Amino acid sequence: MTLEMRMVELETRQAFQDDTIQALNDVVVEQGRVIDRLQLQMAELIKRHEEMVGQYGSEGEEAPPPHY
């Protein structure tokens, strides 16, 4: 393999690696956005749960069924 052929091979590999790195970066950025949305949704669900527990009491405070 000549030096020129090796250089072409290395440049070709680098081009493919650059494309792969960019694609992976795009995925990581999108996953970050998804995580941010999920964290907001989770915070909202926790808030709603705490409000419901405050209104209706916790599950442990439930009266026993009438047959006891």
Swiss-Prot record:
Domain of life: Bacteria
Transmembrane segments: none
Family: Belongs to the SlyX family.
Name of this protein: Protein SlyX homolog
Encoding gene, per UniProt annotation: slyX
